[in-house]
Amino acid sequence: MPRRSILSATERESLLALPDAKDELIRHYTFNETDLSVIRQRRGAANRLGFAVQLCYLRFPGTFLGVDEPPFPPLLRMVAAQLKMPVESWSEYGQREQTRREHLVELQTVFGFKPFTMSHYRQAVHTLTELALQTDKGIVLASALVENLRRQSIILPAMNAIERASAEAITRANRRIYAALTDSLLSPHRQRLDELLKRKDGSKVTWLAWLRQSPAKPNSRHMLEHIERLKSWQALDLPAGIERQVHQNRLLKIAREGGQMTPADLAKFEVQRRYATLVALAIEGMATVTDEIIDLHDRIIGKLFNAAKNKHQQQFQASGKAINDKVRMYGRIGQALIEAKQSGSDPFAAIEAVMPWDTFAASVTEAQTLARPADFDFLHHIGESYATLRRYAPQFLGVLKLRAAPAAKGVLDAIDMLRGMNSDSARKVPADAPTAFIKPRWAKLVLTDDGIDRRYYELCALSELKNALRSGDVWVQGSRQFKDFDEYLVPVEKFATLKLASELPLAVATDCDQYLHDRLELLEAQLATVNRMASANDLPDAIITTASGLKITPLDAAVPDAAQAMIDQTAMLLPHLKITELLMEVDEWTGFTRHFTHLKTSDTAKDKTLLLTTILADAINLGLTKMAESCPGTTYAKLSWLQAWHIRDETYSTALAELVNAQFRQPFAGNWGDGTTSSSDGQNFRTGSKAESTGHINPKYGSSPGRTFYTHISDQYAPFSAKVVNVGIRDSTYVLDGLLYHESDLRIEEHYTDTAGFTDHVFGLMHLLGFRFAPRIRDLGETKLFIPKGDAAYDALKPMISSDRLNIKQIRAHWDEILRLATSIKQGTVTASLMLRKLGSYPRQNGLAVALRELGRIERTLFILDWLQSVELRRRVHAGLNKGEARNALARAVFFYRLGEIRDRSFEQQRYRASGLNLVTAAIVLWNTVYLERATSALRGNGTALDDTLLQYLSPLGWEHINLTGDYLWRSSAKVGAGKFRPLRPLPPA
């Protein structure tokens, strides 16, 4: 029987925790007439109250209250109120043990409660084993068991029995998983897997370590090296379909555990477990390398296009002076010809008066040389980089197993033909080669008088392949990011069942006719209202004219003088402390470090200061090596080991949720909002040193490569989500991820972004998923309104109404596809960002992409109409975005080492940097909130009058009182006792 504990003390308490919210108490503990009739049959007030309380405990949480266990006070008060008797009667209950036993027997008889038996235990283990095939999280299994027992009215056993059943289920599931991954392996498979643990020829690393290395710079040499990695993975030739034998969560967990092991550690594993771990590593490694190869190709193509654009611009600029001279010269000649016509003189003589005829004739020849064709384009410069692509293209096309949707069949046909040419060493493209995929822009380069140009044909095919992979029209066997679009979605059968049962997890009517009727009726009403207000010049702080379009008066963002004085006063009271002291104090309040559990054992970190040191190394961008030097008593080896086993995306996420929830529960945070609105924004960090090649360039941030940390922040200043994204991808791609996949208790209803955060697709999905979307759109007057029919009724809005009309037929035709997509995103079958990237990359004619865009246009138009009518909406959005920008300033101050540059080549390490930074800024926000409340109380206690309406101007984002630099010591200079706080700084003399 497994002995290892799989639940923490906090998790054990949570399983039997009683509700304290009033609505939950009412839901669980309200008696009906039958209940009251049975209760009233007891003799004496104490017995009636005790019997009723025991009934409540048996129903929820499912236990029987022991002799020495006092009842939960809110529950006792509620029961006593229903029975109309004093709570003091409880003290007289159950003085005889026999009374309690009799009550338990009667409760079982009357209400059908059953004791937990060995038969139930065996059934529980059997049931939980099926769940354990999906997850080995102890709390998930134990919670499922407890809920199942409650549904069956089975009295919960002791907690160690629940934990033992869950642990046994995990052990059984592990055996089944190992068997599923190894039973089909033959002797050659096992021999090839064993080779992974041996040292690579001529190298100091094992084959496994080499295969798991990330690619370096996006160039042909590194591409070829990575292709060799994929070929090595493929050479294992694992049994077909083996990756589908095990749930993805468990496969990832086994692979992650194996990735932290040394070859010596893996060799010590029991045989079946060792081969299962190596198979999991191979499956995940193959998918990762496949995706990385496609990403490398995407980035190489992007670099070549950028280089061609730059060369094109440089050449044009270089000829700029000559072109200008010619324009000025022809201006003089033109003026001379005009004067000659007016005077009736000889035009040729007029030209020769400006310059000799031979010089004029030569200038015409020069002008023809300088002139560019009407379809002036940089694309011809791509041909100069053909050799770069040619170095890896044959291997690239040969190693990927591609499939295509009908829309991309032409691209795949061209790829197949290129593969054949590569294998036959053919140089000339056949005259009957596929050409339907060639866009007009490429046609003039590819299709020449001498036939098909091989160089541009291959460049065009590889470029179009990149686009088709992005959109999902072409997918790759063995990939995670580039699968068939349909594979990402909820299965059609499951979707149909959910829709039929009216159980789709969406916030809208799922009947298309009803939905469109309601939204279009609202749209027409809003259009009429705003048109009337615009005609009467009644729009608040806004005006629409035919001549100048929409003009909106900017908001006054000044902070009242009284509020500024309060900000200054409270800032002077906040205690000075080190960042290490702040983190220790916040951990004392929240226990967030307990969430950084061991990957294998789920134990908490034994050395909390070592864990905090590792987190801080991420947050301040110092890295483990330098942090070990700055933190006495710490070594790199210790920090590296702790990071490998305790620091993961999910542990950072749950720890962050702990801090966000603590901020949500702070009464003082209510001055800034109720936790139902949020904003998101991207913050650019340059990539340097080894990480420079992993960065992307966005002209918005200059010419240096970088990464974006995309962060969501609540109206209470809590940063509840952070994600590392490419600077070249629009912010809107990631807006929904933060709203859907955070783990905090926040229930966001309204969300704000800047212009980069919106697209019509995002507007549509936001509405379907139950969020009110409110972006601050730059140049709003140029953002058109969309209506379903003629604009004659809306004369005042004509400058803003698009000439295109809403395509309602397209929405109707693809309604079920829209619902299925939204359902898949809501249920977590696929991330919103992945789907939005693919939809944004689709060709214009794709039905689903167009239908979702049209639905989004309805919602965008409704939003703009609201914006025109409501100054309050504009203020909310402005205030929300200002909070995000202020939080970015704090993040920049914390992330100050290494010049604020990201220098980690590994994307995993870059994610840890972002997560550590977000966690520490959340801790600073919480600490500041607690002490701002104490500071305002101190000011009031000193006789200072504070206006409650001005408290909203205080901000928990200050860091002037926090020492972020120096040696990182974890011994507090001012020890704070449990439940106590640091003294504020003295109040300044009046």
Curated annotation (Swiss-Prot):
Gene Ontology biological process terms in this record: DNA transposition
Residues covered by region (Disordered): 673-698
Compositional bias of kind Polar residues: 674-696
GO MF entry, a single one: DNA binding
Keyword check for Ligase: no
Entry keywords, A to Z: DNA recombination, DNA-binding, Transposable element, Transposition
Pfam families: DDE_Tnp_Tn3, DUF4158
Family in the record: Belongs to the transposase 7 family.
Listed name of the protein: Transposase for transposon Tn3926
Species for this entry: Escherichia coli
